[in-house]
């Protein structure tokens, strides 16, 4: 858990270490479905001067009878489309959760141990002139039980 916290702090700290530019390099957004499984709040940082390679980290949840914490992390690449401020968003990520749920497998882990889902993603992203970003994506969940089709939708603020 300490590793995940340190990763989050390191990514967040880079926001304040780089100079200002006209391209907004940071996003904070809410996501339904997607990498956080049911819902999450995420921070994303573009690592290049223009849209391209980025990294993200978040905190989310999923629910069966109880709520379970998830920690999605990942990298993505934004491919610019002809339409202004439109991108194909392709990424690879992993989501840690406290327990594997029946939603993503046949049975609960009897030890109540942590569980990792690997989540590739492909989607469409749009940045508006008012520094709002939104995204829709296909984010299949790959784990020891197989591949589960999954979708995500995000909306947030660029800064």
Predicted features and spans:
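Transmembrane beta-strand segments of Gram-negative outer membrane beta-barrel proteins
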Residues: 22-32
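Bacterial Sec-dependent N-terminal signal peptides
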Residues: 1-24, 155, 159
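Outer-membrane beta-barrel transmembrane domain signature
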Residues: 23, 35-38, 47-54, 60-159
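OB-fold/S1-family RNA-binding modules
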Residues: 43
């Amino acid at each position: 858990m300490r590793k995940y916290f340190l990763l989050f702090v390191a990514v967040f700290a880079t926001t304040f270490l780089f100079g200002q530019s006209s391209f907004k390099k940071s996003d904070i957004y809410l996501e339904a479905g997607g990498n956080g499984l049911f819902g999450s709040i995420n921070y994303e940082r573009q690592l290049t001067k223009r849209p391209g390679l980025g990294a993200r980290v978040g905190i989310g949840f999923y629910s069966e009878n109880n709520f379970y914490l998830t920690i999605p992390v990942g990298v993505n690449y934004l491919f610019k489309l002809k339409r202004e401020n439109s991108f194909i968003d392709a990424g690879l990520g992993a989501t840690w959760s406290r327990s594997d749920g029946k939603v993503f497998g046949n049975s609960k882990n009897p030890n109540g141990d942590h569980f990792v889902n690997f989540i590739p993603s492909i989607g469409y992203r749009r940045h508006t002139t008012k520094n709002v970003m939104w995204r829709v994506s296909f984010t299949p969940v790959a784990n020891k039980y197989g591949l589960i089709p999954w979708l995500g939708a995000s909306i947030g603020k660029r800064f």
